[in-house]
């Protein structure tokens, strides 16, 4: 079977987003596609850029480091995975926006390092609206305190909105109550605190149409755009700097020498 052209796939995705916007009385211009390139090579970043996608999402700081260095295009880079405190400095140097701020402690760490290096990062608060123990994110009832703290104590940080991940399900409709709850939480925070939180980062390949219907302004799409993620073992570059500067694709073997980590 002939491999489908990426632009054709993207057109179908955009058409589905447009239909979801029409069903919910929204403008398609209000929804951004974030291309999730985790475990794929740097070439998919270039492919997404050429097709008109201007935002790339990565789960891991280390992977973004070599991939961004290997990319010749200029998308925005967003961190969508959990951020450890010891990775904050590197994350601030790499990413334009961090979707996964989940505590006052992490916000304070970001503020401290951002002030040191002169950064002004955009951030989203990750909220675990489903209550799943396997999910990162603060509890919904903690969000008000965190928002107030950031507004009052973190002038370097630009808080743009909220992010969540719905539990996995084969039925996209199962995600709807979780997306609705995040939107309602956002509305409550805006009303009670008097702060604008325009961004709702919610919806992935299996449920993005439902997310758009419920108010998502940023859908995080990987598999639906690029196919299944490569079946790989974790690898680490052993070249100088350990971040594969100038590498083309550490995962496919087109980059520097790598060592398999068992």
Predicted regions and their residues:
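Short, intrinsically disordered C-terminal tails of secreted or membrane-associated proteins
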Residues: 255-257
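Gly/Pro- and small hydrophobic-enriched strand-loop and loop-to-helix capping segments
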Residues: 216-234
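Terminal substrate-recognition subdomain of acyl/acetyltransferases
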Residues: 239
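Conserved alpha/beta-domain cores
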Residues: 1-206, 212-214, 226, 261-262
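Short Gly/Ser/Thr- and charged-rich N-terminal loops/segments
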Residues: 245-248, 252
């Amino acid at each position: 079977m002939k491999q489908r052209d990426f632009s054709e796939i993207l057109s179908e995705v955009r058409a589905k987003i447009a239909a979801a916007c029409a069903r919910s009385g929204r403008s398609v211009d209000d929804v951004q596609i974030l291309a999730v390139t985790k475990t794929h090579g740097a070439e998919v970043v270039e492919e997404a850029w050429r097709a008109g996608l201007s935002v790339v999402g990565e789960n891991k700081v280390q992977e973004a480091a070599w991939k961004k260095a290997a990319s010749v295009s200029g998308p925005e880079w967003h961190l969508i995975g959990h951020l450890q405190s010891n990775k904050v400095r590197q994350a601030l140097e790499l990413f334009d926006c961090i979707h996964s701020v989940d505590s006052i402690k992490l916000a304070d760490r970001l503020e401290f390092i951002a002030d040191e290096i002169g950064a002004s990062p955009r951030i989203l608060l990750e909220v675990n609206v489903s209550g799943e123990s396997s999910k990162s994110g603060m509890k919904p009832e903690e969000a008000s305190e965190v928002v107030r703290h950031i507004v009052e104590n973190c002038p370097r940080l630009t808080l743009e909105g909220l992010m969540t991940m719905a539990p996995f399900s084969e039925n996209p409709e199962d995600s709807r109550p979780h997306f609705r709850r995040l939107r309602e939480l956002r509305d409550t925070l805006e009303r009670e605190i008097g702060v604008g939180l325009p961004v709702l980062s919610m919806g992935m390949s299996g449920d993005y149409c439902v997310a758009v219907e419920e108010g998502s302004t940023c859908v995080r799409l990987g598999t639906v755009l690029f196919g299944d993620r490569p079946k790989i073992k974790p690898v680490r570059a052993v070249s100088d700097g350990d971040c594969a500067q100038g590498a083309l694709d550490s995962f496919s073997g087109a980059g520097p020498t790598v060592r398999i980590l068992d």
